[in-house]
Amino acid sequence: MKILVLNAGSSTQKSCLYDLTGDTLPQAPPKPIWKGDIDWTIATDHGLLEIKANGVEKKLNLSADDHLKGMSQMLDSLVQGETKVIDDLSEIEIVGHRVVHGGLNYTQATLITQEVKQTIADLIPLAPTHNPAHLEGIETVEKLLGNVPQLAVFDTAFHSTLPLEVAAYPLPYEWLEKGLRRYGFHGISHQYCVHRAAELLGKPLNSLKLINCHLGNGCSLAAVKDGISINTTMGFTPLEGLMMGSRSGSIDPEIPIFLIRDHGFTPEDVITVLNKKSGLKGVSGVSSDLRAIQKAIQEGNEKAQLAFKMYIHRLRFYIGAMLASLGGLDALIFTAGVGENSSEVREQACEAFGFLGLKLDQAKNESRPVDEDIATPDSKVRVLVIHTEEDWAIAKECWHQLTQK
């Protein structure tokens, strides 16, 4: 079974092709047979297409203003040249899409119809940088691959189990009735990681209390009890919660009003600042990339040092909040770009929770662990580093969709 997975961002398109054989899914995530990534931000006048297949890596510049042509060139590499892995695009049986916001409409993976597309469009105000890109990806596949089934896998679906007292804001009740509530995000990653954690721990998921720390450019935590999300840090939009690469996370809600009322900012100005010019990037003045922040710290940059200290403070603060929701903790999980690769962030985060009996094995923490427990044998809380596999999680949903027919 050939399954194409598309993960569209505001300025990127990441894709991969899985070839699944047999009547059951493999225990461990398989490697895709082909990967294609487009970055539209590489330069002002062109994008960059990178293809990896058959041990070959190819790069190609793309016209910056023609996303359809770029996608077409990417898919052509599946059937042409050194990166050819299939004879014809018709071999692709289903296409799975990560969709950031499904609101309350969709609590599980859903075959894409005109109605589903309209809902994704209606939710653009709640996910303005992501949902338009998802729609573009869906419609591009329609143009290039015809009537192949397409499946939407929603980042919000995993958090549809949030108790109402967690999901609701302390605002007029009629606003809640109109959908102004906390939805949560990174659900595909959170769900994958807690299932993988149960496998690594050798325990049933429905017996565990877990905190999953998805720390990338976007960051969120999820408190998961018995396999169910009971709290998370992102809310109505992916802006709430932790300090992130270029996003502010939670701030005093009066600040945007103050800027608009007294300093001539437009709502669009404020949205841009909070999403793209805040977080690590805004405080440090250096970058949204933690590696650049740490390099600047070594060079004596005090603003970079402040940014890192704020990042850790807020990470600890919200881990504490998730802990309170759970009433205990079996394992603390780190995943995504920062969570998987920054031993310093893991060490600093865990340091605050020694009172739980959590003990980090320093050697394991610094050994670039993957799907590994990095706590000491006598630690009362396990600490896991898990490589998130969002693409594989989406591919599994596609497999289930086709095999359940």
From Swiss-Prot:
Compartments (UniProt record): Cytoplasm
Active-site residues, Swiss-Prot/TrEMBL: D155
Keywords carried by this UniProt record: ATP-binding, Cytoplasm, Kinase, Magnesium, Metal-binding, Nucleotide-binding, Transferase
Enzyme class: transferase
GO cellular component: cytoplasm
Cofactor(s) required, per the database record: Mg(2+); Mn(2+)
Residue numbers binding ATP: K14, H214, L215, G216, N217, G218, D289, L290, R291, G337, V338, G339, E340, N341
GO terms of biological process kind: acetate metabolic process; acetyl-CoA biosynthetic process
Reactions the enzyme catalyzes: acetate + ATP = acetyl phosphate + ADP
GO MF, one example: ATP binding
EC number: 2.7.2.1
Gene3D superfamilies given in the database record: 3.30.420.40
Site residues (Transition state stabilizer), renumbered to this chain: H186, R247
InterPro entries linked: Ac/propionate_kinase (IPR004372), Aliphatic_acid_kin_short-chain (IPR000890), Aliphatic_acid_kinase_CS (IPR023865), ATPase_NBD (IPR043129)
UniProt-annotated binding residues for Mg(2+): N7, E390
Keyword flag Cytoplasm: yes
Pathway: Metabolic intermediate biosynthesis; acetyl-CoA biosynthesis; acetyl-CoA from acetate: step 1/2
Cofactor binding, per record: Mg(2+). Can also accept Mn(2+).
Binding residues annotated for substrate, in chain numbering: R98
Subunit structure: Homodimer.
Family named by the database record: Belongs to the acetokinase family.
Role according to the record: Catalyzes the formation of acetyl phosphate from acetate and ATP. Can also catalyze the reverse reaction.
Protein name: Acetate kinase
Record lineage: Bacteria, Bacillati, Cyanobacteriota, Cyanophyceae, Oscillatoriophycideae
